[in-house]
A protein has these predicted regions:
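Flexible, surface-exposed loop/gating regions in the mature catalytic domains
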Residues: 25-276
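Positively charged n-region of N-terminal signal peptides that target proteins for export
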Residues: 1-5
Length: 276
């Protein structure tokens, strides 16, 4: 009888365990909005040590800083592609990108297939849907969605068309121009831009379930370290030492919304320990 009871208890416990979601699934929030902002060409130490990065340091204090975050390669374009599609290309910063299928699954196509929304806002983009390589302070190498024919051109918008916060898509990219993203200017210049454009959004987002992801494309040190910061009401502030990269961030967003995994995001785990 004792053995039978143990057997029944084991079956009950096994059934209960099978009904539970995985640790990662249970831990991930599903924000109303995610806004991803990508800066340029700074290592983690440069960002942390620069006294002029005052607003960035404020975001770090209020959010989750990943102290072991890395770009996946060099130079810019393959890192942007990795964050957007889980894939890289073979022609550096070439325009158009080669060595990558322009119909590969990506964050925009996955969201849209799940009846969720996506849009991208690039500062200095001449007009909605423009596909040229460069114009003034705009560079297509910093706009990965333009390299995919399965992303409607209407989703590629100038930053001047950034919507009212209540009209934000599920996931959006914000790309400053090549001065404001620190590519051709100092951290201080980028920090001023971020404060002017993000501070009101972050304040609104605290009450409206919005996650800000601030990251850099690549670092300038031998380990390709970058700063990556998550800020929002669902974030548990602190410093996190797990190793992450652009694939990890993509995987985290995919898992938040129950999406399939694009490219190499299938090879990594989501960020599961930085949430309230």
């Amino acid at each position: 009888m004792f053995a039978f009871r143990c057997f029944v208890l084991a079956l009950v416990l096994a059934g209960s365990a099978a009904a539970l979601p995985s640790t990662a699934d249970a831990a991930l929030p599903r924000p109303a909005h995610v806004v991803i902002v990508v800066e340029e060409n700074r290592s983690l130490a440069q960002v942390l040590d620069d006294p002029h990065a005052e607003y960035i340091h404020e975001l770090i204090r209020d959010g989750a800083l990943f102290t072991n975050a890395h770009g996946v390669t060099h130079p810019s374009l393959p890192n942007y592609l990795a964050l957007f599609s889980g894939l890289t290309n073979d022609n550096q910063d070439g325009c158009p990108a080669t060595g990558i299928s322009n119909t590969a699954p990506n964050l925009a196509t996955l969201l849209r297939a799940a009846h969720l929304s996506f849009a991208a806002y690039a500062e200095a983009l001449p007009e909605e849907g423009w596909t040229g390589c460069a114009a003034g302070r705009y560079g297509r190498k910093h706009a990965p969605w333009v390299h995919f024919s399965n992303v409607p051109r209407t989703l590629s918008k100038p930053f001047s068309a950034f919507p009212k916060y209540t009209d934000l898509p599920t996931v959006s990219f914000v790309i400053p121009d090549i001065v404001d993203d620190m590519h051709d200017a100092s951290i201080e210049v980028g920090d001023v831009w971020l404060k002017r454009n993000l501070k009101p959004l972050v304040a609104w987002g605290r009450a409206n379930d919005t996650l800000l992801i601030l990251t850099w494309d690549e670092g300038l040190d031998p380990d390709n370290t970058i700063a990556t910061v998550f800020v929002g009401p669902m974030v548990k502030p602190g410093r996190y030492a797990e190793r992450i990269n652009h694939y990890t961030v993509l995987r985290t967003i995919e898992d938040m919304y129950g999406l399939p995994h694009a490219g190499h995001s299938a090879d990594v785990a989501p960020i599961a320990n930085a949430w309230r």
